[in-house]
């Protein structure tokens, strides 16, 4: 989320003067063209109060035309302060911020989201969630998040990639990758239990490379911990086909994409925990790596059927395995996959955001 808002600020600064109010530490990470103010409280309640007061003070002095909330959580601040000074209020909603199962949030936050002059959503699925939350259709705009595109989709130096394989004991076989936090929504445990055995039966020397760590301080984290996934893998007789890399650097992630044969994205259908978009599928596509995913939430906006991957009906584990096997045996064209990702370049997304805000998007 922080990286997304960083890019939004950077892109909008090409079309307008931009000032950002962010959490503690954000000033050191700000784009050069963007002024940053901070709300330094670390606890949620004090942070929101401090952010509201600072936003109001800045808005009275600076008189912006638009006040934009980077998520539903800060929507009340944007909407209320905008009304105080006569500015337009804009909210960028991501999915989960429209479905949170919390009485106060649904009673206070969602009505204020619906009162924004414009609500930008990250996918077609999130648009439907916004409509159910009471947002008028004429106030909705879909702008998918952008992705940092590599200079080309070539995998990288072959010697470096071979060394990376050896270092992490990835073997010579086909590599499936999963990139993201080990949350219940991402469905890695279910994939290892229900899908991977079918793939291994047909492609016995393949390896699932899992990038990402388990979230801390989350009630459901244990259900998708490394230990629980390993236990399921042993029960399914696929423990030898899994490697955990944990949290890695951007350079190491580029290596992972460089050696990957397929990206798997087995997101689960969870009504109060939707997948708003599926940025990792675009990041994989930018490197010429196809994705197999369940057709849930905003994922269909991030995977082009038979161009950048395959979409499978939720819960169809045998269909998921069959699609993965087919793409491992007969890969899609890497250049066509990468061409799909070009639609999500930050340059294009910046223009779409500017147009959604009513700014002049002409260079």
Language model features with spans:
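N-terminal subdomain of nucleotide-sugar transferases
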Residues: 1-27, 32
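Short His-centered aromatic/hydrophobic patch
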Residues: 69-75
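Carbohydrate-associated surface elements
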Residues: 125, 146
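Conserved donor-binding/catalytic core segment of Leloir-type glycosyltransferases
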Residues: 159, 170-186, 192, 196-197, ...
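Nucleotide-activated donor-binding/catalytic signature segment of Leloir-type glycosyltransferases, i.e.
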Residues: 212, 222-252
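Acidic donor-binding loop of glycosyltransferase active sites
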Residues: 241, 247, 258-273, 289
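Short hydrophobic beta-strand element within catalytic cores of glycosyltransferases
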Residues: 281-286, 290-293, 303
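Conserved acidic donor-binding segment of nucleotide-sugar-dependent glycosyltransferases
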Residues: 305-306, 310-317, 325-331
């Amino acid at each position: 989320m922080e990286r997304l808002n960083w890019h939004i600020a950077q892109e909008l600064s090409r079309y307008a003067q931009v000032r950002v109010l962010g959490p503690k530490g954000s000033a050191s990470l700000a784009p050069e063209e963007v002024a940053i103010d901070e709300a330094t409280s670390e606890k949620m309640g004090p942070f929101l109060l401090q952010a509201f007061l600072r936003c109001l003070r800045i808005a009275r002095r600076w008189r912006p035309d638009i006040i934009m909330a980077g998520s539903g959580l800060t929507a009340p601040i944007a909407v209320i302060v905008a009304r105080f000074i006569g500015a337009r209020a804009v909210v960028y909603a991501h999915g989960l911020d429209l479905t949170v199962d919390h009485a106060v949030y649904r009673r206070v936050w969602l009505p204020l989201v619906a009162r924004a002059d414009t609500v930008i959503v990250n996918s077609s699925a999130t648009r439907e969630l916004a409509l159910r939350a009471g947002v008028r259709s004429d106030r909705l705009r879909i702008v998918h998040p952008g992705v940092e595109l590599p200079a080309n989709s070539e995998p990288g130096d072959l010697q470096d990639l071979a060394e990376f394989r050896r270092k992490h004991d990835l073997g010579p076989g086909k590599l499936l990758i999963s990139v993201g936090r080990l949350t219940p929504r991402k469905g890695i445990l279910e994939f290892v239990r229900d899908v991977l055995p079918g793939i291994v039966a047909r492609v016995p020397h393949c390896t699932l490379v899992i990038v990402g760590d388990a979230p801390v301080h989350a009630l459901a984290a244990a259900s998708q911990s490394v230990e629980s996934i390993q236990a399921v893998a042993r029960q399914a007789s696929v423990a030898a086909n899994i490697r955990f890399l944990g949290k890695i650097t951007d350079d190491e992630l580029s290596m992972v994409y460089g050696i990957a044969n397929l990206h798997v994205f087995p997101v689960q259908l969870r009504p109060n925990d939707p997948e708003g978009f599926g940025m990792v599928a675009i990041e994989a596509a930018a490197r010429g790596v196809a994705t197999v995913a369940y057709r849930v939430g905003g994922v269909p906006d991030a995977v082009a059927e038979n161009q950048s991957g395959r979409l499978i009906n939720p819960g169809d584990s045998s269909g998921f395995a069959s699609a993965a096997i087919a793409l491992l045996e007969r890969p899609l064209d890497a250049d066509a996959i990468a061409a799909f990702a070009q639609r999500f370049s930050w340059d294009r997304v910046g223009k779409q955001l500017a147009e959604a805000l009513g700014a002049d998007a002409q260079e």
